[in-house]
From Swiss-Prot:
Phylogenetic classification of the source organism: Bacteria, Bacillati, Cyanobacteriota, Cyanophyceae, Synechococcales
SUPFAM superfamilies named in the record: Ribosomal protein L22
HAMAP family: Ribosomal_uL22_B (MF_01331_B)
Superkingdom field: Bacteria
One annotated Gene Ontology cellular component of this protein: cytosolic large ribosomal subunit
Keywords carried by this UniProt record: Ribonucleoprotein, Ribosomal protein, RNA-binding, rRNA-binding
NCBIfam families listed in its UniProt record: rplV_bact
Function: This protein binds specifically to 23S rRNA; its binding is stimulated by other ribosomal proteins, e.g. L4, L17, and L20. It is important during the early stages of 50S assembly. It makes multiple contacts with different domains of the 23S rRNA in the assembled 50S subunit and ribosome.
Record has Ribonucleoprotein as a keyword: yes
UniProt name for this protein: Large ribosomal subunit protein uL22
């Protein structure tokens, strides 16, 4: 999805919906890549020891593909401007316990949103040309 704000800065975004994993654990990773360039973020995600880096990488690549295909932007010039993880509905499961009881288990899910935009240095150099 491509949108532009009132200040004429264009950005591309992608969403991952109903991703298995708690929003707080995904936010821990997103806080590390927010504000970084696309290539730096990919390198960081590759070497982080968290399970949530897989879905985050997938959403990040989708956002960059949206910027490249829909807006014609160079992936090397893109910066992650917004990265959020919001709570989604929990999957409810039951674990059988002793004496006919059942304990409820909530399997957390989250929605991941990532926005990328050209870095200010690349837009300044294009404006001066």
């Amino acid at each position: 999805m491509v949108e532009s704000s009132s200040s004429k800065t264009k950005f591309a975004q992608a969403h991952g919906r109903y991703i298995r994993g708690s929003a707080s654990k995904v936010r821990r990773v997103l806080d590390q890549i927010r504000g970084r360039t696309y290539r730096d973020a990919l390198i960081m995600l590759e070497f982080m020891p968290y399970r949530s880096t897989g879905p985050i990488t997938k959403v990040l690549r989708s956002a960059v593909a949206n910027a490249e295909n829909n807006m014609g932007l160079d992936p090397a010039s893109l910066v992650i401007t917004r990265a959020t993880a919001d709570m989604a509905p929990s999957m409810k499961r039951y674990r059988p316990r002793a004496q006919g009881r059942a304990f409820a288990i909530k399997k957390q899910t989250c929605h991941i949103s990532i926005s990328v935009a050209p870095s200010s240095e690349s837009t300044n150099s294009e404006a001066s040309d």
